[in-house]
Amino acid sequence: MTRKNTATNPWAKFHGPNLGYVIEQYDRYMTNEGSVDPELQELFETFGAPTFQVDVVTGDNKETNFSPQSTGNIETILKAVQVVENIRSFGHLSAHINPMEEPHDGQSLIETMMRELNDVDLKAIPAKTVWPDAPNDVHTALDAIHRLKDVYTKSLAYEFSHIQDSEERTWLHQMVESNSLRQPLSNQKRTALLKRLTAVEGFEQFLHKTFVGQKRFSIEGVDMLVPVLDEMIAEGAKAGVEDVMIGMAHRGRLSVLAHVLEKPYSHMFAEFKHATIQSDDKTNHNAGWTGDVKYHLGREQVVGNETVRTRVTLANNPSHLEFVNPVVEGYARAAQENRKKAGYPEQDSSKSFVILVHGDAAFPGQGIVSETLNLSRLNAYQTGGTIHIIANNTIGFTTDSYDSRSTRYSSDLAKGFDIPIVHVNADDPEACLAAANLAIQYRLRFKKDILIDLIGYRRYGHNEMDDPAVTQPQVYKKIKNHPTVRAIYAEQLKAEGVLSSDEVETITQFTQEQLKAEYAQVPPADTSEAAIHVKVPDVVARGIQPIDTGLPLETLRAINEGLLSWPEGFNVYPKVKKILERRRTALDADGKVEWALAESLAFASILQEGTPIRLTGQDSQRGTFAQRHIVLHDTETNETYSPLHRLPNINASFSVHNSPLSEAAVVGFEYGYNVFAPETLVMWEAQYGDFANTAQALFDQYVSSGRAKWGQKSGLVLLLPHGYEGQGPEHSSARPERFLQLAAENNWTVANLTSAAQYFHILRRQASILGTEAVRPLVIMTPKSLLRHPLTASTGSELSEGCFQPALEQEKLGTKPTKVKRLIFTTGKMAIDLAAEIESGKHEYNLDELHIVRIEQLYPFPAEKVQSIIKRFKNLEEIIWVQEEPRNMGAWHYMAPILFELAGDKLKTGYIGRPDRSSPSGGDPHAHKAEQELIIAHALDTNYNFRQDKQEIEVYSN
């Protein structure tokens, strides 16, 4: 017997599918009490039939029993509930989100179930049974289904079902179902929106007619991108956001520059005419000496009104699609962090946010996209949520979507990262603004990524010289006859009585007059020598001047004591503790400082001088080779501690993070961070230098050339473990030849060091130039086996005195200048191998006839110092370059012309090393050892004459 208890109502928490399930179980219970779960059986016995909380007709709150006896058909309720869920989950398949196509999929999922229901039955079911949040004017299940179809299957469509967090999912559904996003716009705002669209279209058409055939990568077809960005920036500014960072490719970029970032039309036109026009002092992000095409340039601009303003930054961008994404994320993280205190920086993600504008072909096609998405929830890289916009013109150059992705939507990749997706028809301006509003509100509330798929078309070809009808003839017949979004919206406003035809025409004429007036300000093309051949700035051409980077020994000892201290009760791993304790006497008179300690001393001293540090890499906290131990782990609690957070007299942050297994996205992020935080020593460390080449696009397009193209300064440090130790082709070479090939115009420093002191000094030198015009990136081929090698360890006095030396001479050689016949130039580990062989005394060499110079700084080459060394040896006969890399790799092809010039006509110049190879290294450690020994023997044997050696070692002479 059922005993109904009216004191409480446990059914209040059940609604939608859950309520349907409970009703179904109650039906089974009434047939057979033992057929349901014991817990449900107890509920039914105690509280009776499930109830709902609404009156069918009035919508008033009123508890009503809902049992099989009162409904007559449980299946009808369950089917109605399922229809509602299908609308939410699959409504996007029926939505009209592509302006060039009618919806043709998805109807079956909803309509099939609807055919099993009839209107009479649906009208008998209260709306709140199937839709608990139904507004009061929605009374029945039939009303609910019609209303929800309006929400989910029109110009806006949503994909939320994959969101794992129920709170987020509920909020998203409530936002779109409450219609708060689609509140009617005021006539004033609708008129302003039409004016904006008129400006965008007018600008593009003016360019099309005035600069015929010039590339501009028109926005036409997704014109609403500009108002969408406007809306997001305005709403962000109202919420107190100080910085909005935008990354986008070239499609639509000129219109975004002109309208969102307020770059004057006259400046845009001047770039088309190759004219020089007075700067507005807000284009500092693209003032390089080689320059770049107009649709790659960025800009920074403060926008808003007198009461609410925010800084908007559009990042400079190459044509390597999507590689700007992690760079802009780095901008945002730098803008969010306070680096003026010891410890990790304090992050406030409400200070800035990122908008990334993607292409529909590039978003699923470029791996850097997923690498960057993976950063979004990681402690070291998250920026509190990014708003993604796919400017979806449904084509990639000439490639249709069915040839460019394996999924229905270009946005599908985002589902794997728990990102809500909003599809919107780019021909429905007000729907686009609703999507923008939802995106910014979601980001501000949940601090997570969200994506808008802005679906339009491309009115012209990939560029304006391309005829798209050659490859997409049918589509472009449609597009040719398709009205623009401005025309569509103008007709809508006229039809609704918001504007008259004359008022619409006045708006159009105003735009045209404004464009003509701006064009009239542009002078003729500037063909002067100064305009065509812009010189490298003197401060760059001069290079880095010598800087005293030594520190008093007492200061170093005090720092070292702090580095070897940890909180009382902190349990350091015994093996690590032993390693650290060995460092305690390193600065004594008879002690030696190994590489890792020199690094820690440099870091600590840099922090004490007020420079923040950020170090990331796949194993950077411990160090790939278990050398660094800059973050300690308590063996009992797993808590972490970094001594660099507790040293005295530090007022700058130190952040060290283990990165995800990514090179490209992480390098891009660190580069962007450094550009936006130029006072910070930002360092990226490869696990092995061999893996750095997966970030090659970042090295090529940003790190090496960003300043020349855009005037974008960076002091990023790349730490690339390099050295041949018989570990095979994937763990030997950071490919220094590639960094040297990119070296020009003093764009960066490339170093391959041979002592801990040199590492100490070059880090301190790099820190000293941050935030100055002399700054440039630093690329270091860091050691592996040499980290603990006695010949790379340094005395305390070598750290306390002097500065970084771009070239070093081998001690105890060259002491009899008149006898020296052979001068060896080498770098990095090869120099230590030669020194170790000499010190071992295993073989007899005529060392009086030999001298060795270590080139510590490969670029810029220390020519003056090397020339002074050569001049000392009056009887010199030959200059030799010795390396362990194959001849077509390493530094030889960079060094050869330098050495030939230094040698002149009187000296022979030669190469000793491995022959040309397609792979950096062999895989057999025994063969490696034999080759290495042969290189060393030939180099140190001054009687060895130049020839092609039969034992796989290349010896070459001019």
Swiss-Prot record:
GO terms in the biological process aspect are: glycolytic process; tricarboxylic acid cycle
Q: Which GO terms describe its cellular component?
A: cytosol; oxoglutarate dehydrogenase complex
Entries under CDD domains matching the protein: TPP_E1_OGDC_like (cd02016)
Q: Give the catalytic activity.
A: N(6)-[(R)-lipoyl]-L-lysyl-[protein] + 2-oxoglutarate + H(+) = N(6)-[(R)-S(8)-succinyldihydrolipoyl]-L-lysyl-[protein] + CO2
Give UniProt keywords alphabetically: Glycolysis, Oxidoreductase, Thiamine pyrophosphate
Coiled coil (UniProt feature): none
Q: Which cofactor does it need?
A: thiamine diphosphate
Q: How does it assemble?
A: Homodimer. Part of the 2-oxoglutarate dehydrogenase (OGDH) complex composed of E1 (2-oxoglutarate dehydrogenase), E2 (dihydrolipoamide succinyltransferase) and E3 (dihydrolipoamide dehydrogenase); the complex contains multiple copies of the three enzymatic components (E1, E2 and E3).
Name this protein carries in UniProt? 2-oxoglutarate dehydrogenase E1 component
- The protein's organism comes out as Bacillus cytotoxicus (strain DSM 22905 / CIP 110041 / 391-98 / NVH 391-98)
Q: What broad taxonomic lineage does this protein's source fall under?
A: Bacteria, Bacillati, Bacillota, Bacilli, Bacillales
**Gene name, Swiss-Prot/TrEMBL:** odhA
